[in-house]
């Protein structure tokens, strides 16, 4: 491939060892002008091992995904891309989206291409400047962190994989300039209350079953694109972050005499797709991924590893152990079943039965039968979209045997999100399980392990919402017509 620059023909050369592409036009320097000491930036070999690209070769090599400039979640730094194809492979293997067959760019914003990219050519969309702008405008900045964030962020600061760094992150966020720091497990508990109630209502009416979880925006986007016929099977509940944002902007601001127009809410997430979700659900003003927060902490030279542990602020403070396990595949299912059991029986689960271990694990599609009183619930858990097709086709065709299905886009659930620190791919499964185990361990240690037992949730319903599925709850915590992208251009 040749280009002209001021009468000079510019070429591209590919490293025969690692595939790195040297583009004379981008570098503004001919390959022949490079000194003998120059070496490949990727693998270090000499320039003599570079071959000039011809048309046929560039077609074979140009295998990176296209990222629309308006993509709300992911950005691509073109001059870092070496066309290795890892991003395409991730999208095809994990999502089942075959890029060569695309007639237009299809993206569910999950960021698994970001995780696969070794060159950092694909990154979560950087938006830290929006936080700085809000601070300069004198807004009250409020942060809330998702469960999976606290078991991954320590990895970037030399801590062991699976270290539970919640207290240190609260301290860091305060140093960054957040006036209040809340726990999204509170929003997860609220989601459980609404979702368990919705499931029981659907079971009683035998309507729109099976019910799918709806807190993963990449899964919702996938369903909208490939299975629009099943959208009425998705729970109408907003995600924990969606509910948390609404409660901060409404309940919390009202209780604390704050002007919600002068409050700036920031969700700290493992998930790139949340950047897309908040465009459709108001309440949260900004999403910063774990990798963005890591950059902010490092740029401010905060000694994260040696920070003291701080507590969350109260009134929308901490959640239960059930809210904590939302960050793991099967966690939403298990948390919802704990509360559904209580709502159906009016009795607490016995201590030795509170863990629904049948729904745990790393198998991409799992199923279980859960007996609650006279009801036997058939449930399924999916955490890799490429493996979801069989179950989704059954729901589409009206032949599904299930009552309740949890779907998470990323392997391992939120702990494997596109905005998390990258893992060595040869050890990824093992390291994801360490993150998951940290969440389950925190659940086991909590005094409150069921969402309905959280006193702050009880107070919220008594003071503000009334009861699950009330008119106010539906107005603030549910989507009337479930299409995240109904206003997409």
What are these regions (language model features)?
Residues 12, 18, 37, 46, ...:
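Non-ligating segments of multi-cofactor redox enzymes
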Residues 26-29, 55-56, 381-388:
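A short, sequence-level motif marking secondary-structure junctions
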Residues 5, 124-489:
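Iron-sulfur-associated redox domains of electron-transfer enzymes in respiratory
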Residues 12, 16-26, 41-56, 75-76, ...:
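Iron-sulfur cluster-binding cysteine motifs and their immediate structural context
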Residues 1-9:
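Short, Lys/Arg-enriched N-terminal segments with co-localized hydrophobic residues
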Residues 25-31, 66-72, 77, 96, ...:
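Short, intrinsically disordered, charge-biased short linear motifs at domain edges
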Residues 72, 82, 108, 164-165, ...:
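Residue-level recognition of alpha-helix initiation/capping sites
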Residues 30-38, 55-63, 101-106, 126-137, ...:
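Short cysteine/histidine-rich metal-coordination sites, predominantly Zn2+-binding motifs
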């Amino acid at each position: 491939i040749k280009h002209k620059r001021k009468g000079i023909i510019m070429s591209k050369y590919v490293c025969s060892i690692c595939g790195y592409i040297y583009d004379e036009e981008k570098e503004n320097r001919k390959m022949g002008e490079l000194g003998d000491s120059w070496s490949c930036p990727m693998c270090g070999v000499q320039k003599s091992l570079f071959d000039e690209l011809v048309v046929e070769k560039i077609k074979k090599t140009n295998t990176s995904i296209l990222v629309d400039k308006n993509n709300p979640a992911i950005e691509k730094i073109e001059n870092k891309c070496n066309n290795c194809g890892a991003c395409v492979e991730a999208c095809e293997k994990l999502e089942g989206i075959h890029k060569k067959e695309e007639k237009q760019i299809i993206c569910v914003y999950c960021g698994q291409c970001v995780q696969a990219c070794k060159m950092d050519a694909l990154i979560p969309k950087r938006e830290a400047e929006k936080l700085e702008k809000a601070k300069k405008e004198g807004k009250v900045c409020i942060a809330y962190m998702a469960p999976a964030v606290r078991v991954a962020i320590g990895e970037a600061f030399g801590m062991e994989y699976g270290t539970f760094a919640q207290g240190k992150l609260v301290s860091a966020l305060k140093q960054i300039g957040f006036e209040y720091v809340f726990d999204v497990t509170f929003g997860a508990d609220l989601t459980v209350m609404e979702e368990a109630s919705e499931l029981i209502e659907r079971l009683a009416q035998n309507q729109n079953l099976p019910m799918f979880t709806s807190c993963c925006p990449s899964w919702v986007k996938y369903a909208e694109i490939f299975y629009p016929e099943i959208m009425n099977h998705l729970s109408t509940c907003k995600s924990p972050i969606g509910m948390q944002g609404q409660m901060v902007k409404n309940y919390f601001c009202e209780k604390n005499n704050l002007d919600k127009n002068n409050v700036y809410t920031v969700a700290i997430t493992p998930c790139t797709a949340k950047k897309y979700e908040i465009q459709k659900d108001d309440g949260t003003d900004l999403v910063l991924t774990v990798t963005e927060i890591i950059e902010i902490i490092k740029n401010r030279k905060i000694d994260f590893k040696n920070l003291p542990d701080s507590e969350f602020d109260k009134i929308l403070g901490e959640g239960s152990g059930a809210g904590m396990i939302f960050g793991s595949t099967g966690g939403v299912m298990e948390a919802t079943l704990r509360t559904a059991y209580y709502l159906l029986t009016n009795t607490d689960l016995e201590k030795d039965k509170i863990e629904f271990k049948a729904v745990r694990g790393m198998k991409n599609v799992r199923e279980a039968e859960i007996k609650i009183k006279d009801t036997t619930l058939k449930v399924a858990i999916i955490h890799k979209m490429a493996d979801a097709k069989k179950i989704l086709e059954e729901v589409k065709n009206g032949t599904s045997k299930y009552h309740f299905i949890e779907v998470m886009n990323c392997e391992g659930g939120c702990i494997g999100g596109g905005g998390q620190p990258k893992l060595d791919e040869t050890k990824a499964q093992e390291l994801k399980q360490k993150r998951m185990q940290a969440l389950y361990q925190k659940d086991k240690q909590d005094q409150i392990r069921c969402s309905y037992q959280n006193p702050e949730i009880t107070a919220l319903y008594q003071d503000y919402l009334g009861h699950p599925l009330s008119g106010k709850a539906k107005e603030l915590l549910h989507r009337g017509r479930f299409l995240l992208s109904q206003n997409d251009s």
